Amino acid sequence: MTTIVLIVHGLIAVALLGAITHQAMAICAPPHAKPHSFFGHFRAIPAERFANAIVFLYLASWLLGAFVYLYFKIDIQPYLERDRHWHAMGFFDLKEDFVVIGLGILPAYWLCWRRPVDGQNDRMRMVLTVLLAFIVWWSFLVGHVLNDIRGFGS
């Protein structure tokens, strides 16, 4: 059961990774990018359309990750500690902290993207989106590294 939840968690994380990366690239792209350039393609789809999906995917990924976390703490972490993977454990501790910080900024992120653009929210949108993108990328990469060190079913 845990392996199935981990796989679904990973699939949702990939969808979240794609959505937040696209939105971050779109908002950080130059506003006058040529239509057929690399950044122009990011700007072609309005970044506002991603906000609700990102909030939903973040919460779904967090809930599934919380379920898998119990298995990790009981069955996987003791092996990592025994084998002295202290760097990996430290990165995972940072991941835990970053994910909770992401949960804390999620309402502000959603509120900034819900309001119409009035020029005042532009900088706040960019900062919150880039911060959330960093958290999602960090969590994704650390989760994969830990799974590679001592994966499920080992």
What do the PLM-derived regions correspond to, one by one?
Residues 1-154:
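Polytopic transmembrane helical bundles with strong interfacial aromatic enrichment
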